[in-house]
């Protein structure tokens, strides 16, 4: 399947979670076996080209795509979690959201010093979470140069923000709006 075929599998839900928002729902994409498999193939191809030695994904939808890409490539997966979800000593990073703050944590023993880690997530909007994840992975010793997404919302400038921080950013598709 082409990326245009995959784009047609993404459902748009108007006015969710608030009026004026066009929510890009991946449920219809991941429910389509051939579509999900093709999506993982496309992302794995990009991760392989980036020289990935491991894949990281952010909770929650980044787990869907990141773990599948890692499995397809025979690589390990590093879950980037919300606070308090890991049963071991973690390292974390606080970061700003549009309205407030949040925190990400990882198990630093999941990363080897200098290991090339590619970030995979479902969607990039403002880029804040991906930027924080890249910084956190680097704090643990990872070499992070690439972030891959299924969907980019270019009007929110997240990809530009990540590129400005030195990351190569690729998405399988983009959609207008927020």
UniProtKB/Swiss-Prot annotation:
EC number: 2.4.2.7
Pathway: Purine metabolism; AMP biosynthesis via salvage pathway; AMP from adenine: step 1/1
Gene Ontology CC terms: cytoplasm
Family listed: Belongs to the purine/pyrimidine phosphoribosyltransferase family.
Its job: Catalyzes a salvage reaction resulting in the formation of AMP, that is energically less costly than de novo synthesis.
Main enzyme class: transferase
Presence of the UniProt keyword Glycosyltransferase in the record: yes
Species whose genome carries this gene: Novosphingobium aromaticivorans (strain ATCC 700278 / DSM 12444 / CCUG 56034 / CIP 105152 / NBRC 16084 / F199)
Gene assigned in the entry: apt
Protein name stated in the entry: Adenine phosphoribosyltransferase
Assembly information from the UniProt record: Homodimer.
């Amino acid at each position: 399947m082409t990326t245009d075929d995959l784009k047609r599998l993404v459902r748009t839900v108007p006015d969710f979670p608030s009026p004026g928002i066009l929510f890009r729902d991946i449920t219809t994409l991941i429910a389509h076996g051939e579509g999900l498999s093709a999506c993982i193939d496309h992302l794995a191809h990009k991760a392989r080209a980036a020289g990935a030695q491991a894949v990281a994904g952010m909770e929650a939808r980044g787990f869907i795509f990141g773990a599948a890409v890692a499995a397809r490539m025979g690589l390990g997966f590093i879950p980037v979690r919300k606070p308090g979800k890991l049963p071991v000593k973690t390292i974390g990073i606080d970061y700003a959201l549009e309205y407030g703050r949040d925190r990400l944590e990882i198990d630093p023993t999941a990363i080897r010093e200098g290991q090339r880690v590619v970030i995979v997530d479902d969607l990039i909007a403002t880029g804040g979470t991906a930027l924080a994840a890249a910084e956190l992975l680097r704090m643990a010793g990872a070499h992070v140069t690439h972030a891959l997404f299924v969907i980019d919302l270019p009007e929110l400038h997240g990809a530009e923000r990540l590129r400005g921080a030195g990351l190569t950013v690729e998405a399988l598709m983009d959609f207008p709006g927020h």
